[in-house]
Amino acid sequence: MNRPIFIGITGGTGSGKSTVARAIFESLPEKNIAIIEQDSYYRDQSHLALEERVKTNYDHPLAFDTALLTEHLMLLAQNKTIEKPIYDFERHTRKKEFEVIEPRDIMILEGIMILDDPALRDMLDIKIFVDTDADVRIIRRIRRDMEERGRTLTSVIQQYLTTVRPAHLQFVEPNKRYANIIIPEGGDNQVAIDIMVAKIKTIIQERS
């Protein structure tokens, strides 16, 4: 079995990273493909009280266990299975359970900080930056955090102003320079997604 093709999809919070990843996933139904979310690799905080966990800046590179994520990608590159963490966003720590991920022909890694670490970045064969206006991103973030993560409107807005926006300007936006491809307007850009899928199919054909 060949080494998996690693595709990294990044961009600001609410930019449409997951939508692009899912669109690529669904456009390649005949191939073995899997998606890994960087959010699963937030550091374990079970040793902290809940009131301490909520103070963590989850939009900073240090919030992620990048060493573990890189190790897992290396194992997948060797066609070995991994035990991917499962993160509990209401309790702000990892669950005891994990998800077994087997190596596939195509592994999509999606997250806000996947281009920040050089070792992790160098493992990615294709690096995509999803570029979406800030006002669209904050609306999507509010909707997601309230509907899927049990957050209040006040807490989401406060977090955006104090950590999310500063982190985007300091870390996420500068990492755009490492991307091979920049997709404006995220999941709404079907033309860009179609081009990406065609490129992936070409790579697969060249390796077969």
From Swiss-Prot:
It is found in: Cytoplasm. GO terms for molecular function: ATP binding; cytidine kinase activity; uridine kinase activity. Its main location: cytoplasm. Signal peptide: none annotated. ATP binds at G11, G12, T13, G14, S15, G16, K17, S18. Keywords: ATP-binding, Cytoplasm, Kinase, Nucleotide-binding, Transferase. CDD domains: UMPK. Pfam families: PRK. It catalyses: uridine + ATP = UMP + ADP + H(+); cytidine + ATP = CMP + ADP + H(+). GO terms for biological process: CTP salvage; UMP salvage. SUPFAM superfamilies: P-loop containing nucleoside triphosphate hydrolases. Pathway: Pyrimidine metabolism; CTP biosynthesis via salvage pathway; CTP from cytidine: step 1/3; Pyrimidine metabolism; UMP biosynthesis via salvage pathway; UMP from uridine: step 1/1. Its EC number is 2.7.1.48. InterPro entries: P-loop_NTPase (IPR027417), PRK/URK (IPR006083), Uridine_kinase (IPR026008), Uridine_kinase-like (IPR000764). One of its GO terms (cellular component) is cytoplasm. Belongs to the uridine kinase family. HAMAP family: Uridine_kinase. This is Uridine kinase. It comes from Alkaliphilus metalliredigens (strain QYMF). The lineage of its organism: Bacteria, Bacillati, Bacillota, Clostridia, Peptostreptococcales.
